[in-house]
Amino acid sequence: YSELRDVQTWIKENILDKIELPNCVKAFVKGRNIMENAKMHEGRKYILKVDITNFFESIGVRQVYVAFRKMGYDRSVAAWLANLCTAKIEDYKYEQLEDQEEIQKLFNDLYHKSEPFLVQGAPTSPGLANIICNRMDKRMMGLANKHGFTYSRYADDMTFSADKKDRLPKVSMIRKIVETEGFHLNDEKIELLHEGNRQIVTGLLVDNHVRVPGRYKKDI
């Protein structure tokens, strides 16, 4: 596995890190972070947060192959790169997960998935996920420009904000786009925050100005 990881690190640094991503993408991009993500929604009256379930595992080898083809690689090289960056379920490193229920849930979600997919912890997975989400992000930004809300994505966390509630996209509209791109929403993590709530985006309070929540300060 160490040799494979070295190869994946080379792919990340020499191929994936050179791909330009839209400004709404705030995770796994040099110079972007949770602070920058939170600042996009600072002081907004309404914030809608949704989460993509099994983010990395939802991306199969065929999508990875297409991504490398779009970068200009011929079929054989794209197939070789895609296979290096994905794994089948029997290769999945379950020891990365400590919680037995979490392991069982992941297995139940993935046991039917016959094709290799992106694996959490692989150096190439974050960059490839961002690249493969490019069309989805652009569709969300198109809606944002049309309806007057702000959109950002930090890995599997998608955030929408506006000063008027009716400017926010309907969850059904978000779901339709997400599902046509091959993903699914985690219904348990859909959350609408409004002025007066503790508005937390990627772990930071964003109501008046971005700051660390008080309870985290106490822990520190």
What is the predicted role of each segment?
Residues 4, 8, 21, 31, ...:
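Alpha-helix initiation and N-capping motif
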Residues 4-56:
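Active-site-proximal segment of RNA-dependent polymerases
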Residues 42-154, 159-194, 215:
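Conserved polymerase palm-domain catalytic core
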Residues 200-220:
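Active-site and adjacent loop segments of nucleotide-processing enzymes
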